[in-house]
Amino acid sequence: MARKIKIFDTTLRDGEQTPGVSLTVEEKIEIAKQLARLNVDVIEAGFPISSPGEFEAVKRIAREVRGPTIAALARAVKKDIDAAGEALKDAESKRIHTFIATSLIHMKYKLRKTPEEVKKMAVEAVEYATKYTDDIEFSAEDATRSDWNFLVEVYEAVIDAGATTINVPDTVGYTTPEEFYELIRYLKRNITNLNGVTISVHCHNDLGLAVANSLSAVRAGADQVEVTVNGIGERAGNAALEEVVVALDVRKDFYNVETGINLGEIARTSKLVARLTGIEVPPNKAVVGANAFAHESGIHQDGVLKERTTYEIIDPRKLGFSGSKIVLGKHSGRHAFRKKLEEMGYRLSEEEINRLFAKFKEIADRKKGLTELDIEAIVQEELGKGKGKYSVEVLHVISGKISTATVRVQGDGIDKIESAWSSNGPIDALFAAINRALGIDCKLKEYRVSSVTSGRDALGEVLVRVEYNGEIYVGRGLSTDIIEASAQAYLSALNRIRR
């Protein structure tokens, strides 16, 4: 039978300590209600003594949010514990979380107290907290830089005083998975009164190991993991909730544990926290980043389209996302391109697909990530222009008071003729050079440029109307380069002329 791992979410307390983040009371309540839908076991709602606003937020969450246990943080000081107890009084299920540092560096320089004085303060704090609740968590701040024997002493003393959860924080993100595993095992072997007491871990990400350390602790026997949504928090952040719970779910065969988290709410929770905190999720962020289930490599796309599990270890729909994302770019293959065209409703011949794929590859080399609008524009432009009698290559265009364009034209009996022309503007020079190469006298009646897609590397569409022998001919061109699009449009119009 799988062992239950409690998920203690501290997004509203440690997460809000992210530099630049400040949530209103209403925003905290909104996040707390979403965390309840996610089905976390404990919500650490805040640090009530720190400000009137923080006290009010904890009080409102305690009153309005049902399901999870609501926790409030307090130093090992009576006034902090009183504030926490008062803020939590309306909670359906409440916990006071008190802490004091136990490492030599903290005791000497921050607290200026001896180990015995620190242990006494810890015990008195836990005893005092029992007047408000019988669910008390004690944290030995900076545990991973503390003497292991002293940790055992302190934890045994606070358990005797009434602590029901002992937390082992890696406060400065100092430990490694192997060392943390050994520490948790050591505590489990040496704390003599641990029966029925929850061992919790709280990992910071200063060395990028918060999730790995948390998972290592679970394997060593920890019962509770403290996390934040999107991994936000002090400095480099905390262990990310979504990464920890998804790892435990995907590797249930290895860890043999379950969290009870409603995985279908992961995406919604991540987006809500990102929006309200203003901390964007990096695109390459595990589990919830925009690229977490995106595939651009042709080999990967081909595999995913044939069988999703070839390159995905979890179905994104299980986490509340719409599905995998095939990103069309310069690494994409013909299979993914064909699939995208079919999804867009196009049923094309092999010859048409080959033409479109060649154009797609040409544009993809210059544009990062083609959108559906880009693909639509390529289809309309390529299939609308026909094969054409002539093709043009723009060799170079020099702009200035006098602009010069040099082109190479071939086709319909013309073998790569180069032509140059100077004029008042680059487009005039370009069209005149093409006319000269083809020996044709056309008059430009209309020239129009529009952006087909968005972004700095957007596709631009050029429309031209030219007059030849009293008839009007229309041409269109599409490219990330307006000069090139203009040349394509002009040739498109000339290819319609019957001579």
Swiss-Prot record:
Reported cofactor(s): Mn(2+)
Biological role: Catalyzes the condensation of the acetyl group of acetyl-CoA with 3-methyl-2-oxobutanoate (2-ketoisovalerate) to form 3-carboxy-3-hydroxy-4-methylpentanoate (2-isopropylmalate).
GO MF annotations, alphabetized: 2-isopropylmalate synthase activity; acetyl-CoA C-acetyltransferase activity; manganese ion binding
Family: Belongs to the alpha-IPM synthase/homocitrate synthase family. LeuA type 1 subfamily.
Pyruvate carboxyltransferase domain sequence ranges: 5-267
InterPro entries, per database record: 2-IPM_HCS-like, 2-isopropylmalate_synth_dimer, AIPM/Hcit_synth_CS, Aldolase_TIM, LeuA/HCS_post-cat, LeuA_allosteric_dom_sf, LeuA_bact_synth, PYR_CT
Protein name as it appears in the record: 2-isopropylmalate synthase
Matching Pfam families: HCS_D2, HMGL-like, LeuA_dimer
EC number: 2.3.3.13
Keywords: Amino-acid biosynthesis, Branched-chain amino acid biosynthesis, Cytoplasm, Leucine biosynthesis, Manganese, Metal-binding, Transferase
Listed GO CC annotations: cytoplasm
Major location category of this protein: cytoplasm
